Amino acid sequence: MEKKLLIAVLIPPAVIIAYSLYFHIDFVNVLKTMDPVLLALFVATYLVQLLILAIRDSRITKVPYFTAFKARLLGNAVGLVIPGWAGQDLARASVYSRYNQDLVKSFALSLSEAFYDVVIGSLMFLVLVEIRASPVDFIYILATLGNVVGWVAGTGYVIFTSKKVVKAEERLIKLMRLENYYSLLQKGKDMVKEATTKEALIVNSLLTLLGYLVQSVAFYYIVPSFPLDVLVNMTYFAASLIPVPASSGFAELGLSIYFIPRVVVALRILELIDYSLGFLLIREISLKDLKRQFDEIRSYGKLSERPSS
């Protein structure tokens, strides 16, 4: 595991350096000549976005606002090296579980947050992509469409089957010999359904939209056209849906649609700086306790705080 994490950590800088060498860009010079105003803008808009999303996340999880902010900041950092639910979603859940002492509930609600992140972000990209369409966009169109369909279908299934007996689901659980996990699945479904009311869908979607718009403001310093700035930001987001550490390769490719290579390198460095800020809170995750709980699930299909207790 340590070797895999080390490789994941090394991939993003290695790809940026390789990109720089390919286009004959002085990587060190890009760092030295980084515009401090642009750096400040990227950090400021990123943190403001997280402050907005923390309002949404605290509504969903019922944890204190600052706890939600820390979880979001830390989750994004972990997501740099561990893509998908095992990264940022699980990291946020571990922070929430320190507050509510319930890992299953925390993880289910963390996935509810991810629903808004992915679906709203993907729809924004799909709506705006025609502003400056490129053959390369086909990759990101597939990624965003697939995620919209998958998340909407999956979340819809969870909501409509909560507290219901689904024979096909029971047969599948038995076939896969996961009977001990069934109560955990049902508990997770209940948490998602409770958090997904009509009012919550509207308010949480609007907060997510606002967060992405605020984050896009940083690009206005380079390209003074806000619709295009939002598209650039959402293209970067679309690249993050592809499960590789820090969207390495795909982020550079997406940014290359709009910018010259030197600017691409600078923007990638800025984005990595933003997302790495969360590592300052890495102690918020109790890795030892998290491993203990998941080992218990793996062995017995149960948690210390069982759904029936």
What name fits each language-model region?
Residues 1-75, 131-241, 270-309:
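Predominantly cytoplasmic-facing regulatory/coupling regions of multi-pass membrane proteins
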Residues 74, 89-94, 102-105, 189-192:
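Long, hydrophobic/aromatic-enriched structural stretches that serve as scaffold segments
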Residues 78, 82, 107-130, 149, ...:
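Membrane-embedded alpha-helical segments of transport systems
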Residues 69-70, 84, 88-89, 99-115, ...:
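Membrane-interface alpha-helices at helix entry/exit sites of multi-pass transporters
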Residues 86, 91-92, 105-106, 121-125, ...:
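Extended hydrophobic secondary-structure segments
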Residues 51-56, 84-93, 231, 236-256:
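Transmembrane helix boundary and interhelical junction motifs in multipass membrane proteins
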Residues 59, 80, 84, 92-100:
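Helix-loop junctions at the membrane interface of multi-pass solute transporters
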